[in-house]
Structures are given as structure tokens and as C-alpha cells.
Amino acid sequence: MSIFIGGAWPYANGSLHIGHAAALLPGDILARYYRQKGEEVLYVSGSDCNGTPISIRAKKENKSVKEIADFYHKEFKETFEKLGFTYDLYSRTDSPLHHEIVQELFLQLYEKKFLYTKKIKQLYCTFDNQFLPDRFVEGKCPNCGTHSRGDQCDNCSAILDPIDLVDKRCSICSNEPEVRETEHFYYVFSEFQNLLETYLNDAEETVRWRKNAINLTKRYLREGLPDRAVTRDLPNGIPVPIDGFRDKKIYVWFEAVAGYYTASVDWAQKLQNNITDFWNNRTKSYYVHGKDNIPFHTIIWPAILSGLEIEPLPEYIISSEYLTLENKKISTSNNWAIWLNDIIKKYDADSIRYFLTINAPEMKDANFSWREFIYSHNSELLGSYGNFINRTLKFIEKYFESEIPTKYLEGEILYNLKELYTTVGNLVESGHMKQALEEIFEYIRSANKFYDDMKPWALRESDIEKCKEVLATCVIIILNLGQMLNPFIPFSGKKIEDMFKTKLNTWNYISNLPNKLSDVSMLFDRIDLKKIDEEVLELQQTSSR
């Protein structure tokens, strides 16, 4: 089976924060899991380097768009690598290949009569002498009344036309823009209404999408799909490849989602592979993103793929709700955020991955608090998992000269461990990463109870053979837990591999024992509880500057 996984493309206009990681981490868990199962996996993403957000940042910093995009693309790649993300290709939308393929796709849709031109009213800033891209316009959302950008409301997730905003202002100069006429290409979304309704019903019946994706997509389809502009008068982006329109750019929402396909082509060309191995009706596809990206993955991208007759359509939609910070909405403009390139310097990547998974905003908003993060690390990763491994292996190292006993106990504890592979695997495949990790740590608690109940320290005096069997059983548990946790917290898994000089890279139950331990080391260090107040204070101070 081939597995395609697409992670949402962050805008290269500012650093990544913990909210980005919470939404994107399920993609890496899926990729690692399926690779361990032996499936063919293609996991792609990239930096969104076109469109308005980068232009706004460039204007503010008096830099070129390329300088801004280059800086953040490099930072993104390094940050994802430090967090253990295993993209097969992390690309960017300003690459020549992306531009070339998007223009080809645009022409294919034009030739198929899915694109047509239309004269429209668009906002123009007389002070800055330019048509305003949607994100250059701010005002009140006409649906819910909250402050919004011109392209989409963060509060109600509505896709907007900036002309409909109330109290419109140019985000560059804060002046009120005027309405002028311009001509653009439109995509015939209305022709795909019935197809998308069938597509949605199938996803709902088979429970392949999260509820927020089902409900939001239902709302859009119930309201009826309007045709939408696919070109804009933008300062940067991909030029429209048709005479008379070459000064216009292909709208970012169209070309950014096409990045999943262009990155796949790029990967295939680099490795001399066949793109159709992953773009066919037998491939299982996952799209991993935040709640605000739902319509782009459940309506826009499926409609474009259908027009191009490219398969598969997005099958699994792993759409996270929002992550708050200390019970307040993350705000990059107010610096109320924990930046990934900062937290990764101070804390173990596995600690970050663990907390953002066990506390994931899968079905409802979740909160990141420094207290919970540090207590979670100390009590679960260190206190439960790390302690079980350390006390078992230190016992073997001290009393058996690191020689691992050869005979283990068959019983309920190992039967449950074998069954756990199926339980966790099914949960991961259906996108329930939080519950999968909870199941593993529930088992870890039972493993600690097994150790305490069997009392190997007492058996060493009264029944040395039984003591060896208990320790060997615990080693089997450690090996399988290390392997099963690899998709979630891979860096600790590597430490376990090093201690046993073995590989933990399949999704099959391990029953063979290694002969000898290498140097035993702690998987995790305790975090001083004083860090809680220090981190909260730093957050408050930086956000008030």
C-alpha cells in the first residue's frame, strides 16, 4: 500500500510557534508509523513563500520578499529537523519547478473550460497606488462582526471577499480604500457542488474526517459553492501564463494547495521515482493541518484535483482545533506565543512532542501551560516511562554484569503488550494520536505495577531464576515500548537502541532478547519546578514589550 501524507505549508513570514507544531505533528507520527509497518510513504510539505503575508513583512522590514522567504524557510527546515519531523521533501512555493507545474495545471484547467474571466470590483489604495490583495485589507467580518483580514475570518472561519468587510482599511497605511474595476480568472466551483456533497457524505459515513471538518464543509456546501477568483493583482507570486493577464498572479490559495502535488513531482524527479506510485486511486492519503485550513483541503483542493482528473482526493482530514497558551489565545502580533526555535533550545524534543500529542487539540481547543508541560515531563516521561526502564536496566547492570537473562515469563502482561500493537495502530491510522499515546502510557503504568508486584530485588535473594525471568520480561516490555513509541517520541527510542545495540524499526512484536546491555543512561532529566515561574514570567515580560 502507498501512503501519501501532506502537512500544511506555513507562511514564511514569521517564526513557527507551538500551535503550528500541535497541528502538524500528527503528520510525522503517521509517516513514522507507516514506515515501521513497511508501507511505501511519501510525506511532503514546504514553506508558503508567495502571496501577501510575506509582502507585508518585507514592506515593514524594508527587505525584499526573497530575503524574508529565504530567512524563514531556512529557520522552518532547521526547526522541523530538531523536532524530529521526517519529511521526504520539504519544499517552497517560490521554487522554479513549483511555478512551472502550477502554470501547467492552470493551463490544463483553462483548456478544460473550468476557468473563465470576469470583470469585478476590487479594493484599490490611492495612497499606496495599488490594488490591495485580500490580506492587505482589514475590517469587521460581515458574518460575526469580529476584526478580520480580507481573505478569511479567524473567528468564524468564513472565507471572505474583502469588499464585504465593514469599516475597511488598507493594512499598509490604514486609509480607506476605494473600489475599482479589474478582470480576473474564476474557477467553476459551482460545477463541483454535487461531487463534493457525495465526497463529504462518504467521508462522514466512513469516519475519515474530524468533526470540525465535517461540520464546516457541510456549512459551505449548504450555503452553495460560488465560483471564486483564482488570480489577483499581487506584488509577488506565480504569473498567469496567458497573454493579456501576465501581469497578474495566480491566487495563493490555488497554488499553495497545489504544492502537495508539485512537491511530489520534485521528490520523484530528485530520486528518479514515479509520481503515480502515490497519486493514484489505490493510495491512502492524509492531510494534516489546523482548523483554519479546512476549506482549502475539503473543498478547494478536491475541486481542483477533480477538474484535473488527478487521484486520490484527500481521504483522511486530520484537522486540529486551536491551541491556547496559559488559557489565552496565541497572538503573534502581541508576542503571546512560545516560539519553536526557542523552546527546542531549552527542552527535549521528545518532551515537546509528548505534551503536544497527549494534550492535542484533536476534538476541542487545548491549552499549553508551563506548569502542565513540566509536570507532564517529570511525572509521565521521566517518572513513569523513564523510571521503569532505568530501574530495570540498572538492576541488570549492577547485579548481572549487564548480561540480559535469556528466559522470560509468558503471561497477561506480555499478551496485553502484543495486543497493544493492534490497538495503537488502529488509532494512529484513524488519526487519534492522543488516544493512541494514552493507551501506551496506560500500559506503562501496568508495567510499573508488574515490576513492583514481582519485587525482583527480593527475588534476587529468595529465587534467583524467577528474578531473571522477571527482568527478562521487563526487557521485552522495554524493547516493544521503545519501538511502539518511536512514532511519538523518536529520540528516546534511539537511546534505547543504543543501550541494547539493536534496531527498533518495525511494527511487529519483539520476542528475541539481546545478549548484553551497553552503557545504561537516563532517557530524560528532571526539569526543576522553578522553571515554571521563570517561563511564565519571561512570557509575560516579552509579550508586554
From Swiss-Prot:
Spans through the membrane? none
Statement: the UniProt record of this protein carries the keyword Hydrolase: no
| Documented EC number(s) | 6.1.1.10
Question: Any idea where this protein resides?
Answer: Cytoplasm
Gene Ontology terms for molecular function? ATP binding; metal ion binding; methionine-tRNA ligase activity
Residues that bind Zn(2+), according to the entry? 141, 144, 153, 156
Annotated ATP binding lies at: 332
Predominant location of this chain? cytoplasm
User: Which GO terms fall under biological process for this protein?
Assistant: methionyl-tRNA aminoacylation
Q: What is this protein called?
A: Methionine--tRNA ligase
